């Protein structure tokens, strides 16, 4: 038996909606904030960061999802690439990973082995190692990884901190969620290749910049607009996006034009609706709200220093009010 992929809500399209996540997180805020905590629940960033000593901070994160595809090697590799992205988004280097694998009793052991083998290879390629994990029998299949990284405490990146005048840049095309949902030849294979690629090289490019990025995150289940909204949490800024400049995966625009949507489309739209201004078309919204599994890095950088592995998609401006923080032009 193989794990059946729920394509319309597999991968990061299965991510719980932001209001539910906020509710759950509120109940986890127990006790005092640790003295060495740099980033934690209150910041709601891509990973937690704790200062271990003057020169070292520990980055920890966990991520996983139901299978978006049938091939176990692709599933494991994509899940690992997706999980390490959170470490890279904090400016850290991957160290170790723990794996959690839930599966029905009838699942072929060879299938499970292929998931683990490909995931472990991705972690190793990033300079880390899978050092343990846990397995349980479950009615539904889920694979996730908890990844640790190390970074200097003074060089941690965060999702907030973008400044007016910064350029908004993206390292991967959007639309893989649409391609997985449609499962059409050509676009499907292209999406697999995009999702298997880690953001390690993109993070390295950001590290080589003369001026550190003002803000960095990765595009995941809430789509580009959802993660841009999260970058505005500190207030005072708005994100102006040129929809025509956004890189799109092969075939994704055609899929959007024929009405393909993922299971996360409506919840992602609801999340950003009050913040959104401009006149994006329905097809543009399908791309901009598309949940990404192993999506690219999204960064706010100096406009005169855009790394080669990134595409400029917009500009950070001063906010004119507290609500209209996402401006989309076409």
Model-predicted regions and their roles:
Residues 8-9, 38-40, 74, 89, ...:
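Short glycine/serine/threonine-biased micro-segments
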Residues 1-9, 18-23, 35, 105-129, ...:
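Glycine-/charge-enriched secondary-structure boundary and capping motifs
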Residues 146-155, 187-209:
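Active-site glycine-rich loop that binds ribose-phosphate moieties when present
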């Amino acid at each position: 038996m193989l794990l059946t992929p729920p394509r319309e809500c597999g991968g990061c399209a299965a991510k719980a909606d932001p209001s539910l996540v906020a509710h759950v997180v509120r109940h986890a805020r127990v006790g005092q904030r640790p003295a060495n905590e740099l980033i934690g629940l209150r910041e709601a960033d891509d990973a937690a960061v704790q200062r271990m000593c003057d020169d070292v901070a520990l980055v920890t994160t966990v991520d996983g999802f139901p299978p978006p595809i049938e091939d176990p090697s692709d599933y494991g590799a994509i899940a690992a690439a997706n999980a390490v992205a959170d470490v890279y988004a904090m400016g850290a280097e991957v160290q170790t990973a723990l794996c959690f694998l839930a599966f029905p009793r009838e699942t072929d052991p060879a299938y499970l082995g292929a998931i683990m083998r490909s995931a472990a290879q991705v972690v190793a390629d990033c300079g880390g190692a899978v050092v343990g994990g846990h397995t349980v029998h479950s009615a539904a299949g889920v694979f996730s990884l908890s990844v640790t990284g190390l970074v200097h405490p003074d060089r941690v990146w965060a999702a907030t901190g973008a400044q007016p005048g910064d350029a908004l840049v993206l390292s991967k095309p959007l639309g893989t969620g649409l391609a997985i949902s449609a499962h059409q030849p050509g676009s499907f294979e292209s999406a697999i290749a995009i999702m298997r690629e880690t953001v390690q090289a993109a993070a390295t490019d950001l590290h080589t910049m003369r001026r550190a990025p003002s803000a960095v995150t990765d595009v995941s289940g809430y789509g580009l607009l959802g993660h841009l909204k999260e970058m505005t949490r500190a207030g005072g800024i708005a994100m102006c996006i040129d929809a025509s400049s956004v890189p799109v995966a092969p075939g994704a625009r055609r899929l959007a034009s024929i009405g393909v949507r993922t299971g996360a489309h409506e919840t992602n739209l609801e999340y950003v609706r009050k913040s959104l201004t401009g006149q994006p078309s329905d097809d543009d919204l399908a791309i901009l709200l598309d949940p990404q599994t192993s999506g690219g890095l999204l960064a706010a950088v100096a406009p005169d220093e855009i790394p080669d592995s990134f595409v400029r998609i917009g500009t950070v401006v001063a906010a004119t009010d507290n609500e209209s923080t996402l401006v989309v032009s076409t």
